[in-house]
Amino acid sequence: MSLSTLSHPAAAAAAATGSGKSHFRTAPAAQSVRFPKARPPVPAAVSAASAAVHADPAEDRVSSLSQVSGVLGSQWGDEGKGKLVDVLAPRFDIVARCQGGANAGHTIYNAEGKKFALHLVPSGILHEGTLCVVGNGAVIHVPGFFGEIDGLESNGVRCDGRILVSDRAHLLFDLHQVVDGLREAELENSFIGTTKRGIGPCYSSKVTRNGLRVCDLRHMDTFGDKLDVLFKDAASRFQGFQYSKSMLKEEVERYKKFADRLEPFIADTVHVLNESIQQKKKILVEGGQATMLDIDFGTYPFVTSSSPSAGGICTGLGIAPRVIGDLIGVVKAYTSRVGSGPFPTELFGEEGDRLRKAGMEFGTTTGRPRRCGWLDIVALKYCCQINGFSSFNLTKLDVLSGLSEIKVGVSYSRPDGQKLQSFPGDLDTLEQVQVNYEVLPGWQTDISSVRSYNELPQAARLYVERIEELVGVPVHYIGVGPGRDALIYK
């Protein structure tokens, strides 16, 4: 198969400097990004679904996606974004993460049904012809990143030459994780319920401009001084944070080794992605977390520290808004949430336990049991306003099998009965809303083996179509199980 190459600008710069003495690392001059010219074959699941509905436009769902497309969460996370990215990846040259870090947990399965729980590595990694990019908007915990790579390679997944990490991405240190726990302890009754992965403190370092970036690993002569500032800042803010010069020395030595191993992965991903767009390469953006956890648009302060909505694609990858096309919103057939924060449609007692057990609702990253409730149309419409979704992937429809009736939260009212016209930004208002429900009939049939939309029970189809009517966005993909093939194309 013939190959085209896209050289790293870092490689060109290294070559231009000649053999003059330098105290910092540069990328090898021969380093390049290689793409297969021919698109990999469509997965069997897609081919089978297409063959089954040959006369239906559904066969074009995957191939008709725009050059730059995105998969974003449209609730509070854990919707099943990784599975859809894994299914779509063979149709794309690049899969890119634009924000977040190891707080995101994406569970995917290979063709043999083996489970992979990814946190930072993009979900396209299981497909040999796909290049995976971790953009500048992400935060990189280097030991965790290497741990994921080691786990993948020990299971036969080749990562060498297939992952690029932005030189502009910020480094997340163990100290950020320590600070995360100390801050949660200080908040006491205002417990936010973070993943304790250090995400918030790392983004805080970024905003206060004392954070370190991946490119700083190429300047180890000044790395220690910059890290010293970070350690001292943490020690000045938290009494429980112990710091010494020996700790700093140990961490610097540790990162010298990390720098050597990480070097082949480092690239100017802004350049790589924009050059790829010019070359008509197809890019799939994989969002972490979800819109209702967005730092600006989520249920603040019970949110993440980045922008997992459409705007985060541009700021987290360095690509222009005009090049972004289809955005697929991934929405669970019910709702779940990890940690604290408002949850208007939450179910308690046996009803909540039933959804939690049937859906195996335990966090990929934390293992914590997720809070569960009915589908919230008000929140979903709000997410659509922010992101402009072209379609939905409705996941875990099979979990609702066996219910005699299914409720959908269609509107909010104040305690005095006044109906709200939009999703409230004020937390006090949101905590007091009364949810108005629409009741739909359930179905008793196990639908986990269904692969054609018309074969779903009538009540299941009614549920899907009612969601489309209420929100005004078509459902193109329906998940009926965890496996790669457990997907219906509508």
UniProtKB/Swiss-Prot annotation:
GTP binds at residues 77-83, 105-107, 370, 396-398, 479-481. SMART domains: Adenylsucc_synt (SM00788). InterPro entries: Adenylosuccin_syn_GTP-bd (IPR018220), Adenylosuccin_syn_Lys_AS (IPR033128), Adenylosuccinate_synth_dom1 (IPR042109), Adenylosuccinate_synth_dom2 (IPR042110), Adenylosuccinate_synth_dom3 (IPR042111), Adenylosuccinate_synthetase (IPR001114), P-loop_NTPase (IPR027417). CDD domains: AdSS. Its main location: plastid. Pathway: Purine metabolism; AMP biosynthesis via de novo pathway; AMP from IMP: step 1/2. Residues 14-36 are annotated as: Disordered. The keyword Amino-acid biosynthesis does not apply. Mg(2+) binds at residues 78, 105. IMP binds at residues 78-81, 103-106, 195, 209, 289, 304, 368. The keyword Nucleotide-binding applies. Its EC number is 6.3.4.4. It is found in: Plastid, Chloroplast. Substrate binds at residues 364-370. PANTHER family: ADENYLOSUCCINATE SYNTHETASE (PTHR11846), ADENYLOSUCCINATE SYNTHETASE 1, CHLOROPLASTIC (PTHR11846:SF19). Belongs to the adenylosuccinate synthetase family. Homodimer. NCBIfam families: PRK01117.1, purA. This is Adenylosuccinate synthetase 1, chloroplastic. It comes from Sorghum bicolor. The gene is PURA1.
